[in-house]
Amino acid sequence: MVREKVKVSTRTLQWKCVESRRDSKRLYYGRFILSPLMKGQADTIGIAMRRALLGEIEGTCITRAKSENIPHDYSNIVGIQESVHEILMNLNEIVLRSNLYGTRNALICVQGPGYITARDIILPPSVEIIDNTQHIATLTEPIDLCIELKIERNRGYSLKMSNNFEDRSYPIDAVFMPVQNANHSIHSYGNGNEKQEILFLEIWTNGSLTPKEALHEASRNLINLFIPFLHVEEETVYLENNQHQVTLPFFPFHNRLVNLRKKKKELAFQYIFIDQLELPPRIYNCLKKSNIHTLLDLLNNSQEDLIKIEHFHIEDVKKILDILEKK
């Protein structure tokens, strides 16, 4: 087997596409590299990019169907080969491309007999179908079938909650994910202490975006998430009308500390010295320097007080709690 070779930059950080193909109208593949990276950077970028590719990119889907011909979504209609459930599943698989915001309406209005495909959907100007041949239903008799559709642009998943039988309107599970899969791998090269890394990114899309477009959009979304950290922190924040205040949760071990105080008796605490707790030397020395000599002294300090002690960490609170809960 011949091993593939790629040319990479050894000084300037660069990316390039090393493979791109279209397997079908609804399956695109792209492979990209980014180099040179220092040890550990490739994994950091790869994990972030994969999550952004799968979760941060918006897609367009049919989310609702309405028809006077449909009594309920598990029924069969005379003159139509497929069940209503099968038609809704077929609509769920239609791949759309758009730059719309909010929702739009579309329509299918066909007279049988004949096949209904994605080509028969009457779309708003801002939406296009990726594969016009996608099957929707088969009309076996000369009947009229009209289905009103709702189209939305969003990200992630939208699972149908309930059916509205009164207006013959049925929600459709939507997967707003143009990227079907994304993987990353790392290749190290170089000698000794000068080892560097190449990040390989593989992206599969449904055709509504090319892998290169998906890579650009995921990168922009990540940049937008990190931009606020580049700004100087405002000491005084004035809330606008569209903002609200939230109560911050306690630190993770606060509840355990409170429960421990309730379970133990204070009288016993004052006679238990921290020397008896078999604490790690560093934690023991930190507590001693802060005049914490007994278990009562220790539990009279809140978690916030403890982590203010010099060289004391939040992990140390966890260690102390683990030891005390075993006593």
Swiss-Prot record:
Coiled coil: none annotated. This is DNA-directed RNA polymerase subunit alpha. DNA-dependent RNA polymerase catalyzes the transcription of DNA into RNA using the four ribonucleoside triphosphates as substrates. It comes from Olimarabidopsis pumila (Dwarf rocket). In plastids the minimal PEP RNA polymerase catalytic core is composed of four subunits: alpha, beta, beta', and beta''. When a (nuclear-encoded) sigma factor is associated with the core the holoenzyme is formed, which can initiate transcription. It is found in: Plastid, Chloroplast. Residues 265-327 are annotated as: Alpha C-terminal domain (alpha-CTD). The gene is rpoA. NCBIfam families: rpoA.
